[in-house]
């Protein structure tokens, strides 16, 4: 029987794939998408030949040239698959590539599975993957496509973001969060809105130095297709860095394939703290005890977010911790403050009064928002901002009015009617 490849299967019609699926006894093949069906057939063929069909995220060992595919949480595990230097060179594989193929179990004196044949790279034919442009050569642009987050009437948080701090594909956003202001809840709502409104977007949630129970909570709260990658507080700082950098490389590889990628990160502050513990001391120290050299690599991570002229985008929304009682955290926030093109501030005083979402609408905003929303929409946003007051009572009234409207469009209509009534009353 002829060896199947991803390219030969992609050239078949759905009817042809169904015939192959019957031949290889693939279950429930009619319910699968074309992509899922191709991988199910490849897996069935590998098992028929006495092998396994596995995939993982590639991490190349720099000094050796070979690498390992990490199938579990982007981290080393007993399930890792060895991939030779010759396979990496042949297909121009890079850190963060998702490599799929036939795998043999470890032999008597071996620790790892061995990759026999590369069948797919990031879901594409390996020969096509060789031709892609490297991420640094892609042209960065301001975000110009709105990432709509509005879903249900009750989900006011995401409706406010759409109104006052619109997020575009390729946004580099900071969520500035004091303790107990509802940042985890907000991240979950943003994640679920992206999954609902933009199912083709690849979403990764990266949790650095977080509590293990919080990781479980987020895993159970989001869509199954979302990658929740974590390095909890009981791991060493080196692990925080390793996992974060592999997630970054993964996102870059997908953007090279012209995909839209979103990373929701909690938090950039803790990643910077991890780098501060690991990097060789430069001999200089900023206020709070942080080494200036510790900022370079977290800034490289955050700075990778961009809209791409050639197609695809890379969005990062990262939390920055403030008012924690640590001077270091404030210095880290000040250092990242000017690097983003969108900021969403959470207000502790609102959270203490149990006013949720505790968003400080006055301080929050997006650069170049005119590229994301229409002129009429922008005029309405500016009209709202002109009437704003820096008080919890105003925010409470604003939230009450939002909940009274079904969606943002209705909220705008109600606001226009109010302004007309006030204008008539003045006359």
What is each stretch, according to the model?
Residues 41-43, 60-62, 71-73, 85, ...:
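Flexible glycine-/small-residue-rich
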Residues 55, 83-86, 102-105, 114, ...:
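Short beta-alpha junctions and helix-cap segments that line functional grooves
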Residues 93, 106-175:
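P-loop NTP-binding catalytic core
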Residues 50-54, 156-160, 247-249:
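Phosphate-interacting basic helix/loop segments used at nucleotide- and nucleic-acid interfaces
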Residues 35-129:
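N-terminal "pre-motor" subdomain/linker immediately upstream of P-loop NTPase catalytic cores
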Residues 173, 181-184, 189-427:
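P-loop NTPase catalytic core
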Residues 5, 13-16, 64, 195, ...:
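OB-fold/S1-family RNA-binding modules
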Residues 1-49:
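Basic helix-extension-helix modules of the SAP/HeH family
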């Amino acid at each position: 029987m002829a060896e199947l490849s991803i390219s030969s299967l992609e050239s078949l019609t759905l009817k042809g794939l169904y015939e192959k699926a019957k031949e290889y006894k693939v279950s429930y093949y009619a319910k699968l998408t074309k992509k899922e069906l191709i991988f199910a057939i490849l897996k069935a063929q590998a098992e028929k030949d006495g092998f396994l069909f596995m995939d993982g995220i590639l991490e190349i060992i720099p000094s050796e040239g070979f690498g390992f595919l990490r199938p579990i949480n982007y981290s080393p595990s007993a399930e890792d698959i060895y991939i030779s230097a010759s396979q990496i060179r042949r297909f121009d594989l890079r850190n963060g590539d998702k490599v799929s193929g036939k795998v043999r179990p470890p032999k008597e004196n071996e620790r790892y599975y061995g990759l026999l044949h590369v069948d797919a790279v990031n879901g594409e034919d390996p020969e096509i993957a060789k031709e892609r442009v490297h991420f640094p050569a892609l042209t960065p642009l301001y975000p110009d496509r709105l990432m709509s987050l509005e879903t249900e009437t009750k989900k006011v948080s995401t409706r406010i973001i759409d109104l006052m701090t619109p997020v575009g594909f390729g946004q580099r956003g900071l969520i500035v969060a004091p303790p107990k202001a509802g940042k985890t809840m907000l991240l979950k709502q943003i994640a679920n809105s992206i999954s609902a409104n933009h199912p083709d977007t690849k979403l990764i949630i990266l949790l650095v130095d977080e509590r293990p129970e919080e990781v479980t909570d987020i895993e159970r709260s989001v869509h199954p297709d979302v990658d929740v990658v974590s390095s909890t507080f009981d791991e060493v700082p080196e692990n925080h860095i390793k996992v974060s950098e592999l997630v970054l490389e993964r996102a870059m590889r997908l953007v090279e394939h012209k995909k839209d990628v979103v990373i929701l990160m909690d938090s950039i502050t803790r990643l910077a703290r991890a780098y501060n513990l690991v990097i060789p001391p430069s001999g200089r120290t900023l206020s709070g005890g942080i080494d200036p050299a510790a900022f370079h690599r977290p800034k490289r991570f955050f700075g990778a977010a961009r809209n791409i002229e050639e197609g695809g985008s890379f969005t990062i929304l990262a939390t920055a911790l403030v008012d924690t009682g640590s001077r270091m955290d404030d210095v880290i926030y000040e250092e990242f403050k000017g690097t983003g093109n969108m900021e969403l501030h959470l207000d502790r005083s609102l959270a203490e009064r149990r006013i949720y979402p505790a968003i400080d609408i006055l301080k929050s905003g997006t650069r170049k928002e005119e590229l994301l929303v229409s002129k009429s929409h922008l005029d309405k946003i500016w009209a709202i901002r002109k009437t704003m007051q820096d008080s919890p009572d105003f925010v409470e009234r604003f939230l009450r009015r939002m909940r009274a409207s079904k969606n943002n469009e209705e909220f705008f209509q109600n606001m226009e009617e109010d302004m007309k009534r006030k204008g008539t009353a003045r006359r």
